Each structure stands twice: as C-alpha cells, then as structure tokens.
C-alpha cells in the first residue's frame, strides 16, 4: 500500500469495499455460529469422562465446557454485558439509546438491517456497508475532542431493551455501536437553547477550538469526516465538544479525483461537493466555517431557502451567511478564510487552531442578545455573500 507525496494513503489502494466485504464475512460467520450454537452445546456436553452421557462434562483447567469459541474482533463487544435503556434520539435508519456496558454509562446506536421486509436488499447492503465503514474508522481514533468508541456488534443475540415491564429481547439482526455517554447532548441543541440570549465570546471561542482540534486530529489521521455540522457534535458535562457520527467518514485519497459524490448536509456542504466536483479534507474546513458562524450567532444558515436555492446560490453566487457587524474581526476573518470558494485558499485545520488560540476573549465580543440588537444589524431575511 503506497502513500502519495503528501503522505496521504490512497483510498482506492486501501479499498474500503474489500474492508466492508471482509466485515460482511465476519458477520456471516458469526450468524452461522449462532445458528449452530445449540448443536455445539449438545456435542460438547455429551462428551464425558468414561464415555457416559450422564457423566460430568469434560472441562479445561476446571473452567467450563469443551467447545468452539468464537473469537471476537478487536472492536466487538460482549452483548451479555450491554443493557439498553431509554431513547435519546431517533433517525431515519435507527435510534440512539442510553445504556450501560460493563457498568459504564454509554450511548448505544442501534441499526436494524430490515430483513423483515421494510427495506430492499440493496438498501440493507448499503446500510451494512455504512455500519462497517463507521466502525472501521471510529474504533481506531483516540482524542479528547472525538467521542470515545467503546465497541460494536454486527448482529448478535443477547441484546436486551429495558422496559417498565422488564427486559425485552432484541432481534438478532439488530447491530449497534457503543460509545461514551455525553450528558450535554448535541451542540446544535445547546445553540438552539441559547438562540435568544446568545453565548459569551469566551464560550464561542472555546467551543470552536474544541471542534477545530478534533478536526485537526482527524485530518492528521487521514480521515475526512464529510458531514461536519453542529448536530454531529456532542457536549460532555464540562461543555467540551466531541465529534461524533462517522457514518460517512472515509480515508482521504491523495488524488482528489478519487473522492466525489454529494455527501454531507445542506447548508454545510462546500461548493465543490454541491457541484459534484472532486474534493478532499478542505470540504471539512468549509463546513467548520459554517459551524463557526452558527456557534457565534446561535442561528441556522439559510433558514428561508430551499435545497435548490441554496445549491445554486452557494455555487454560482458565492452565497454565505451574513456575518454580524458586532462579530470581532479576528473571528470573522477565520470564517471567511474557511468558507472560501477555492479549497486551496482555505487553511488547514491545524492552522485554524492557532488562529483561534490567538483571539483575545477578555474584552467581550459575543453576539448581542435579541432584545439588545438595536445597534447591531445581526440578521436579514435574505442572506448575501
């Protein structure tokens, strides 16, 4: 496996499709073993010292039955140690629950492959591939601004949902990702709660720095997140931002032509992505610029425009969110550099970090609350470049 001149491993040489197929084989093997579990247990318990079926079963080191043991992958959890509790969030393809794993508070992302007839075979294959890719990316990451990955399971028995009437067994085709539980919830929800009163400038810069450091780390690991938005950022109890949801992340190709396709969320997507052009990690930098504006303003970009209007305006008219006049010039400069239409003119995330660190937050500069905005033209219904 060769590296490009910039040290980035080519995605086409890593072959994520092969990785997904490899994980699929592990899943198939696990399901086969599950089906044969009863037969294996009967075979092992029937073997006894002296050849009598009624004798004590053969043991090793006094520890248990002789039999086949499935060797777990390094990222696989033990389903028997997982308790799934209340729902935290619901999405198109699954739910996020609060839970306990091996005595630790966790968040559990559940995906149902949909073998019950609700989805087509192609959709199921796509979901499995997304799940495998997310696990492959996430389990190797270790940074204070990235949500800690604990483990996952791709279709296993033993999962139980705790209800008021007692434990409820989950279907065997349910797959899950287990990560640390972050009580602060999504950054987006935090911003919505502060939409009227806004955030102090010190908090704005702290949140932005957390996100910038997390993205800088991902890029140092040759990972492009591709869906950077405040909804995918979580807060711990100390209000530290941690990046989550690696469902569309992938290893960056040294050749941008190897990375194409409209991936991301409207309002945060870079022009080159919206236009279907090749892109690289700089698409994350663009999305960070939009997030930075959102953190400062506690508002949504382009709330009154449709998908087609945003796509056309961002690509053809250089549409960007209005920067309030009360925004300190140093922070506004970071926004403008990050969302530059030319990816080559955007800074690297490891450059953005010191830019934010150098901003003086001791003299205020936060967004003016809604009831004090007479002297600050903070928003217009029609946003321009």
From Swiss-Prot:
Keyword list (alphabetical) reads: ATP-binding, Cytoplasm, Kinase, Nucleotide-binding, Phosphoprotein, Serine/threonine-protein kinase, Transferase, Tyrosine-protein kinase
Q: In a knockout, what does one observe?
A: Partial impairment in temperature decrease and slightly impaired stomatal opening triggered by blue light (BL). The double mutant cbc1 cbc2 exhibits a reduced voltage-dependent inward-rectifying K(+) current and suppressed low CO(2), red and blue light-induced stomatal opening leading to a severely impaired temperature decrease. Larger stomatal opening under both dark and blue light conditions in cbc1 cbc2 plants, and associated with increased phosphorylation of C-terminal Thr in plasma membrane-type ATPases (AHA1 and AHA2) in guard cells. Altered CO(2)-triggered stomatal closure.
Tell me which domain of life the UniProt entry assigns to the organism this sequence originates from. Eukaryota
Q: Which GO terms describe its cellular component?
A: cytoplasm; cytosol; plasma membrane; plasmodesma; plastid
Active site, renumbered: 227 (proton acceptor)
**EC numbers for this chain:** 2.7.11.1
Record's comment on post-translational modification = Autophosphorylated. Phosphorylated by HT1 in response to low CO(2) concentrations.
One function term, GO molecular function aspect: ATP binding
In which tissues does this protein get expressed?
Expressed in guard cells.
Please identify the protein, giving its name as recorded: Serine/threonine-protein kinase 52
Annotated organism of origin: Arabidopsis thaliana
Gene name of the record: CBC2
